[in-house]
Amino acid sequence: ANSALYEYNAENKLIKATVQNGSLVIEESYTYDYEGNRTSKTTHRSDGVTEYVKYLNDNSSLTNVLAEIDENGTAKCVYTIGADLVSQERNGRTSFYLYDGHGSVVGLANENGAVTDTYSYDAFGNLLKSTGSTENCYRYCGEQFDETTGLYYLRARYMDTSTGRFISQDSYAGSIFDPISLHKYLY
């Protein structure tokens, strides 16, 4: 992105990101539920393209997205959750997630077990190389990557891999017995 402008609500949640890439301006707005979990994303592009995604979440422990729903109420993508994200069903095709020891998605496999897509990252989550064309937003550390903003959504806040930092402060106050936890922008 050439430039980005972020807007936050009173709870320090990102509610709007405006990104300019050359002459193209993209504005994304986000909504959250009462527990602070992201429930929707609306994208408006200066070329007239608009997209809406509602996230159907499982909030039983660590919030996981079960489905992405479009503006007509149609499921664009349905996820299967186990200990980690197991698979996605998108456009009538099922892809299974392959992970490394860090929990990052390093590949996708089809129903026959053939690897269709691969991903490799640097230490901060920047994508170094990818193969394949399957639509997939789950990548580094198994978290959602937003192509428009270049940010990872880690449920509580967003991380910019180009700087290796979060773009907002941690809501956790930290502990004087664990001094590094007092740094509001660390993971």
Residue ranges and their predicted role:
Residues 4-13, 28-37, 52-63, 75-84, ...:
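Aromatic-rich beta-strand edge motifs centered on tyrosine
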Residues 39, 63-65, 85-86, 94, ...:
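Hydrophobic residues embedded in beta-strands of well-ordered beta-sheets
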Residues 90-156, 162:
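A motif-centric feature for acidic-aromatic and gly/ser/thr-rich catalytic loops and repeats
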Residues 9, 15, 84, 165-168, ...:
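Right-handed beta-helix
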Residues 10, 20-22, 34, 46, ...:
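Short, ordered coil/turn segments that flank beta-strands lining enzyme active or ligand-binding pockets
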Residues 1-4, 16-22, 40-47, 65-73, ...:
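Beta-turn initiation residues at beta-strand->coil junctions
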Residues 76, 153-154, 181-182:
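A conserved catalytic-core signature of glycosyltransferases
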Residues 175-180:
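Short linker/helix segments within small regulatory modules
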